[in-house]
Amino acid sequence: MISKYNRPMENLSNLDYSSYLKGWIRTVPNWPQQGVMFRDITPLLQNPKTFRMLIDIYVHRYMMEKVDLVAGLDARGFIIGSVLAYELNVGFVPIRKKGKLPFTTVEEEYELEYGNAAVEMHTDACKPGDRVILIDDLVATGGTMMAGYKLLKRMGADVLEAAAIIELPELGGGQLVRDGGLDLFTVCSYEGH
């Protein structure tokens, strides 16, 4: 859990960062399948000012916390997570799709918005008591985030908080994460999916 004394960026909507960054997220209808409104963060990442602003939001949120690792979910969580880990001067743990890691792994299966999958991490990626921030670009159904959380907990890590750029509240993933005992911080949300 994040310290109640370290919440300088708690209400981003009041500061209008959320609306500004949302303007740099592209919506792609019917991708990867019919009926899905894909939220594409690449325009936000391509602009150095918006990318810096996004990372600074997370840095200011976590810089006063004792964080040992940032764990990023495959694949866009790697982009945000590795930069955040660098800025916080801590290690980075990739949580990958099944079959992508070369060493001994631990695996967790989960349901996606449009199918089933599994994620895994190296068995030596963290140690008991490590304080970890878990990050991805988007929380839809919450399956990927919860799978990452379960992996880290299984390895004995203390997951301080989950973070994402976007939450899709209608799909219930944010609530699933919170109901699962994990605090969730997101920069913006979109109605509809």
Curated annotation (Swiss-Prot):
Keyword annotations from UniProtKB, A to Z: Cytoplasm, Glycosyltransferase, Purine salvage, Transferase
Domain of life according to the entry: Bacteria
Record-level GO cellular component terms: cytoplasm
Location of the protein in the cell: Cytoplasm
Record's catalysed reaction(s): AMP + diphosphate = 5-phospho-alpha-D-ribose 1-diphosphate + adenine
Pfam families referenced in this protein's UniProt entry, alphabetically: Pribosyltran
Alphabetical list of Gene3D superfamilies matching this protein: 3.40.50.2020
Molecular-function GO terms, alphabetical: adenine binding; adenine phosphoribosyltransferase activity; AMP binding
Pathway connected to this protein: Purine metabolism; AMP biosynthesis via salvage pathway; AMP from adenine: step 1/1
Cited function: Catalyzes a salvage reaction resulting in the formation of AMP, that is energically less costly than de novo synthesis.
Family the UniProt entry places it in: Belongs to the purine/pyrimidine phosphoribosyltransferase family.
SUBUNIT field: Homodimer.
Protein name: Adenine phosphoribosyltransferase
Organism: Chromobacterium violaceum (strain ATCC 12472 / DSM 30191 / JCM 1249 / CCUG 213 / NBRC 12614 / NCIMB 9131 / NCTC 9757 / MK)
Organism phylogeny: Bacteria, Pseudomonadati, Pseudomonadota, Betaproteobacteria, Neisseriales
Designated gene of the protein: apt
